[in-house]
Amino acid sequence: MAASGLKVPEMALRVCVVPLALASLWEMATNAQADDTYGEVKFSDLSGFSYLVGVNAVTAAYALVSILLSSLKPLARYDWVILVMDQASAYLLVTSASAAAELLQLARRGDREVSWGEVCSYFGRFCGKATVSLALHAAALACFVALALVSAFRVLSTTGSSCHPPKHAQAQEHEQGRYN
């Protein structure tokens, strides 16, 4: 499949990222719960959840910009920039997902070795919203992983690069091996 044949799936992935990232952001940013006995918990109390909100905002904004750039006349000189930005977005989504998942795991199970009790039995709605946000975040991550692969394919196909050495390099290696 030629790189130009990936235009529609690429655009569909970019369009999908925006609502996924914004829904994840909204679900987490509005996440707070109060309990008469244990007080209040909100997303901003936990740095991993705040990081997830920030990364969702950045990736949604980048996805919007990349949709606009992609809808304009495709300029090959921006292919590398798009590739790097898609990769960076995927990496940011991975790191924020892992930070949020760790917090959610601690909230659900606690950690007896450091005397942290589980809190989801007291703040169930908070944990539920955090889980939904993390699932939406993971879906946005899957889109960006696919976008990074599409972008890499586009860059490699437009620059004529490949994963294999040129035939003359293979011939030279073969000759050197034969005469050494």
Curated annotation (Swiss-Prot):
It is found in: Cell membrane. The keyword Membrane applies. Residues 1-7, 70-79, 151-180 are cytoplasmic. The chain crosses the membrane at residues 8-28, 49-69, 80-100, 130-150. InterPro entries: CASP/CASPL (IPR006459), CASP_dom (IPR006702). It comes from the Eukaryota. Keywords: Cell membrane, Membrane, Transmembrane, Transmembrane helix. It is a multi-pass membrane protein. Residues 29-48, 101-129 are extracellular. Residues 161-180 are annotated as: Disordered. One of its GO terms (cellular component) is plasma membrane. Residues 170-180 have a biased composition (Basic and acidic residues). Pfam families: CASP_dom (PF04535). Homodimer and heterodimers. NCBIfam families: A_tha_TIGR01569. Belongs to the Casparian strip membrane proteins (CASP) family. This is CASP-like protein 2D1. It comes from Sorghum bicolor.
